[in-house]
Amino acid sequence: MIKREDRRQLRLVRHKRLRKKIFGTPERPRLAVFRSEKHMYAQIIDDTKGITLVAASTVEKAMKEKLQKTWNITAAKEVGKLIAERALAKGIKEVVFDRGGFKYHGRVKALADAAREAGLKF
């Protein structure tokens, strides 16, 4: 069985390999997703300036009040909707999706699908 730290290292290797191909620009910033055991995080990043334009996560007080559990697919969908709403409010319509070395499956896929349904294009 693969130990937790080894799984983390393998994910970081995958993420590094992925980041060689994906780069966020001001016209089309990068939607970066991070999945921990208890929370989901999403940021829209302009890599040319190195700044976060929009962020959303299950750690926010409003999200915690809205959700019973912060680690399931329902929570990931809510984060996806929220990040899309905030991005559209700032005038960001297109992004490049960065899965962060995670499989495009489960919570990561749910977040991406919810963001697409809310109006983000990628």
UniProtKB/Swiss-Prot annotation:
This is Large ribosomal subunit protein uL18. This is one of the proteins that bind and probably mediate the attachment of the 5S RNA into the large ribosomal subunit, where it forms part of the central protuberance. Keywords: Ribonucleoprotein, Ribosomal protein, RNA-binding, rRNA-binding. Belongs to the universal ribosomal protein uL18 family. InterPro entries: Ribosomal_uL18_bac-type, Ribosomal_uL18_bac/euk. The gene is rplR. It comes from the Bacteria. One of its GO terms (cellular component) is cytosolic large ribosomal subunit. Part of the 50S ribosomal subunit; part of the 5S rRNA/L5/L18/L25 subcomplex. Contacts the 5S and 23S rRNAs. CDD domains: Ribosomal_L18_L5e. GO terms for molecular function: 5S rRNA binding; structural constituent of ribosome. GO terms for biological process: translation.
